[in-house]
Amino acid sequence: MLPHIPRATGFHTYASVGRELADLHVNYERVEPYPSVQEEASLHAPADPWERYRIGERKMRFPKLGRRDKDFTRLEYNDYVTLTGIPAEAQGYSISGRSPLEWIIDRYHVKTDKASGIVNDPNDFLREQGRPDAVVDLIKRLVTVSMRTQELLVTLPPFETYD
């Protein structure tokens, strides 16, 4: 005998929003880049795009506003490129305690595994793609995913069940 599974009030709304979220998250590389996110290049940025967008050993970071606070509307990609116009609300959506941008910050930098000596260099991936700005483009798209996810979650009715 199967256990009793209560039905959710507003099930069709949950199903519809769930489909939209699944499509959004599975196809995150195809969503439009968030329109307000812009690139600012420093005055000494190289003309060569491979050098301008090069990812180094230093992690990307949100600039500090003081001792503890960070400016989540800006992301220092490297010494030459800063992304601006990121809605602070994009930090409101998190996966395992981190926003998608925080996952990018943590994963996309050159690092060497201490045990094996293997170098993980995201620039190799960029060269394979033939797009030096692929990570910048990904960041813009992840802002769209974060913002749209939050918009969809707000539309869900309170979770209630009935028999």
Describe the residue ranges of each PLM region.
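Sequence-level detector for compositionally biased, low-complexity segments
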Residues: 1-163
